[in-house]
């Protein structure tokens, strides 16, 4: 029989053995430890490995959650890291591309009651913003403003008691007023990109504004500009017209771009035709609304359904049903939430596959090169000390921002929601010392932000920039962006120029 002393010795030995095993596991990092256990320099790389390699793949996107994100309802305040950089850097310029704000649908569901939304701007209803009244008053003083081309014929405010197709809503106006006020805190107040009173010699500091030929993009730009600079001087404002939603300027002719777009559209069509849940949802909706399924598919019903969801309006019913429509479960002639979930789920999968597909990536590189090249030239002019606008605003669409994100290599970015923003910031090192990695004195650097998040080190041109190990700066060298635009964007086409890449036509059966 084991004595008490022997038991104590045995337990002591077991405890020592467990301690050795535990220390061994921790030495080889086979069990997790609190961040900071090994110190800051050791903890950060280990945390990155866990995120990039060992965590499980994210679950499927929830259609309702993603729809709430897409609507971007103006609740609370806008947050973001625009205008923030390490100590010792000075902001030289910021170029902002936005998607217009919330709008009325571009399509109508056949044989369904139309969505009724008031597009008048009124300060006595939601969503309200304290700058709304001043914005409306300032738009009435636009006689001295200059608007190029068709922009001169557009109203500066949405003003219909019942919205028209594609018209900006009051929600869309408030979204951009809020973004403008957020950017004002850093770009105007902190960094002085816009002076309160520009003199003739300081005209280069005025904002450059460009909009596509749609009222909703012009109105969105004006709302953001007012939030950024309340009561701006109309006599110094000129809004340039961009004829193409792709912002391709004089380089819109690109045969390969059209070919890649057609191939990607075929891929999308094949994927949708093979989705049994989507086909069932269209059959059920068509039966409820008493229309042929093919006609319903052609109407792109997810667009008007998203408008119902964003504005908290019940999904539509057949026009033959009484008004107001019957409550569930008697809504047999109506579009259901499950129909909406199915359509949105397929759309989210399609967006994800499109971002990851080589076809769309190549299309995006070609379609967005003119804009990125123009941006690089304008930022380069600022870096060289030449007369150039320090702040530029480009008002565009989802079909502009989505390929821009793909061209930059941001395959994981979410689809551009209403009032999405993509920002390019140019920074300069202020001190006179030589930068880490041998960069020139006074070197310039670039930051890329999407909806306020710094995504610079996720871009194709700077994802390999090692800022932590003394081989580079805390910011991405501007030269990397210049090299990307002038050289690296053509590499997937085995070309050395935009013209050559545009004539590198893919085979009709290509599946890259």
Model-derived segments and spans:
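Signature for phosphate-centric chemistry
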Residues: 7-208, 212-392, 396-512
């Amino acid at each position: 029989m084991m004595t008490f002393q022997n038991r104590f010795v045995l337990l002591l030995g077991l405890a020592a053995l467990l301690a050795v095993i535990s220390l061994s596991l921790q030495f080889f990092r086979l069990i997790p430890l609190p961040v900071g256990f090994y110190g800051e320099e050791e903890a950060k790389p280990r945390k990155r490995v866990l995120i990039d390699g060992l965590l499980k793949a994210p679950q499927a996107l929830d259609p309702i959650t993603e729809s709430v994100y897409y609507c971007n309802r103006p609740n609370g305040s806008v947050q973001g890291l625009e205008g923030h950089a390490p100590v010792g850097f000075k902001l030289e310029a910021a170029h902002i591309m936005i998607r217009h704000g919330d709008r009325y649908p571009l399509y109508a569901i056949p044989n369904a009651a139309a969505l009724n939304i008031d597009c008048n701007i009124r300060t006595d209803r939601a969503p309200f913003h304290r700058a709304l009244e001043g914005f409306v008053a300032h738009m009435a003083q636009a006689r001295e403003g200059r608007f190029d081309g068709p922009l001169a014929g557009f109203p500066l405010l949405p003003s219909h008691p019942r919205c028209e197709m594609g018209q900006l809503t009051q929600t869309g106006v408030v979204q951009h007023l809020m973004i403008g006020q957020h950017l004002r805190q850093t770009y105007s107040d902190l960094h002085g990109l816009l002076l309160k009173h520009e003199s003739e010699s300081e005209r280069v500091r005025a904002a450059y504004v460009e909009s596509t030929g749609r009222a909703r993009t012009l109105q969105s730009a004006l709302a953001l500009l007012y939030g950024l600079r309340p009561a701006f001087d109309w006599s110094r404002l000129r809004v340039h017209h961009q004829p193409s939603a792709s912002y391709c300027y004089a380089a819109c002719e690109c045969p390969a771009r059209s070919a890649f777009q057609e191939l990607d559209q075929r891929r999308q069509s094949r994927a949708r035709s093979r989705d049994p849940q989507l086909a069932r949802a269209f059959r059920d909706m068509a039966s409820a609304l008493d229309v042929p399924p093919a006609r319903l598919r052609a109407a792109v019903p997810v667009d008007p359904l998203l408008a119902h969801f964003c504005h908290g309006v019940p999904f539509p019913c057949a026009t033959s049903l009484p008004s107001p429509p019957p409550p569930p479960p008697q809504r047999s002639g109506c579009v259901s939430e499950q129909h909406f979930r199915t359509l949105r789920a397929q759309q989210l999968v399609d967006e994800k596959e499109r971002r990851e597909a080589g076809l769309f990536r190549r299309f995006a590189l070609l379609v967005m090169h003119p804009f990125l090249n123009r941006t690089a030239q304008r930022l380069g002019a600022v870096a060289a000390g030449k007369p150039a606008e320090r702040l530029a605003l480009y008002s565009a669409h989802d079909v502009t921002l989505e390929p821009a994100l793909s061209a930059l290599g941001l395959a994981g970015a979410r689809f551009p929601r209403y009032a999405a923003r993509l920002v390019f910031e140019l920074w300069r090192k202020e001190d006179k010392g030589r930068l880490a990695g041998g960069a020139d004195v006074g070197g310039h650097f670039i930051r890329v932000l999407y909806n306020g998040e710094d995504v610079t080190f996720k871009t194709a041109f700077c994802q390999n920039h090692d800022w932590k190990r003394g081989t580079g700066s805390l910011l991405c060298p501007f030269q990397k962006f210049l090299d990307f635009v002038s050289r690296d964007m053509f590499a997937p086409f085995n070309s050395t120029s935009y013209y050559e890449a545009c004539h590198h036509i893919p085979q009709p059966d290509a599946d890259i």
